[in-house]
């Protein structure tokens, strides 16, 4: 007959009849409710209880990295999107080598528990982790938050560490200063803005104690310059205090000359820099930008001006399928603003030089569009030329010259095996082959080389694990400098009185950095024993004005103009025209001003040929 597995259960109706009806055959249907399992998985081991200071440890790496931890602290600040926060132990451990604060990262908070607010003292369970990118220093943080419990509310913030009189020479000393403050509240007062708000919402200040002459800070320009200390040593100004906007709904827009009267924030580390993420309530003293022109000049004018100008990504409207230019292709409105600003810059700030040595254009046609804008406004006769390069984005150096005042006799691009090895597709980073223009200026034959060397963007950050930082791009710039110097030597060997200029964005300082010695790119260009010297006209500029670019708050020279002995005799003066690098990046979208038409300041040389 039919098979019934053994098993019965008593009917739970509360009535006992002492018959078979008091029982029911048990169900053995193998549905989810009746399927045997191995049982629940064992719970994970409990998290390791630890104070924030124990999680941070007294070095760069947390001794608890990779472990689930449980800690407590007071919430001091949230990121603007509310997804992450900073937490600080209000009492600390009294050890100056351990941080009392920590960043809690991540994509929201657990479904169980209460969402905290600033001032809440919380218990939190998460995983200790070191966030690190490339050769930058690591950031100790908590991630994968499992639990948050609010223990109390309305707690006052911990006292903020004052940021004043920071280490001002050696980067390792700066790292040693900042690391024990990671994640903690810190404060600046009466600080001087030395770099404008950039496109990432960051700006840089110096404490009042550090903003003194002789430290790299120049009160004339209110900026801090990278400095040559001699023997390959460089002052990279570790006393810089960067302020970011990750905790703000919108960035704080400032420029050199402004002051931060008071600002408190959490110490963070991102993109190779220690920085403050501001809490609400900052007090600022700001001023409006000047009325154009902002450029100033010293010395006589001469009869001819030659200016080198990196115009920063002047691209046309076409996304070229064979170039990596999708991220650089503007909208029609963006291109209109760019051309309007650059045309105003050439007319108002550059004062219509005879020759502009240009970098970062996509092609001759877009450069000619710029020339046509200037011609329509000023009645000049600017003509453009450039040659396609090996650069993956397709940017080129070029010339824009006023054909009503000078003539271009010849233009060509350097070529050959050495050029290929330094600039071409087989080079470490395909780049921009030099462009040579031979100009007739007042009856003088002037040979100008337009250059755009490999950038420093792939080098180690200053605040990195390698000290001194490794500069891997330096090798290629040396190759590029040697190619250019070899061409100059050929010209001067044929005619020692030739008037030769090497100009452009050379992406390097006019002095050696740690480990370079005397064999740095600018020294190669200037020439060694037995070579005719080239003189860098940046040396004629006043110390306070000697910068063409601002990076991470450090004002520095990247753009150069070197001249042969015969051409040096015709020089009257040289000036950097400061109307871009010192101004906030937001002005790049303002067509009503030439300020921030690009990110580099032009370098102008003035000559007397007549």
Language-model-derived ranges and their functions:
Residues 17-21, 25-341, 376-377, 385, ...:
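Extended non-catalytic accessory segments flanking core domains
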Residues 8, 55, 537:
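Short clusters of hydrophobic/aromatic residues that line enzyme substrate/ligand-binding pockets
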Residues 5-7, 74:
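Extended N-terminal export/anchoring regions of large proteins
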Residues 1, 11, 88-90:
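Predominantly extracellular/luminal cell-surface or secreted proteins
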Residues 1-5, 13-23, 29, 106, ...:
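Divalent cation-coordinating acidic motifs and surrounding scaffolds
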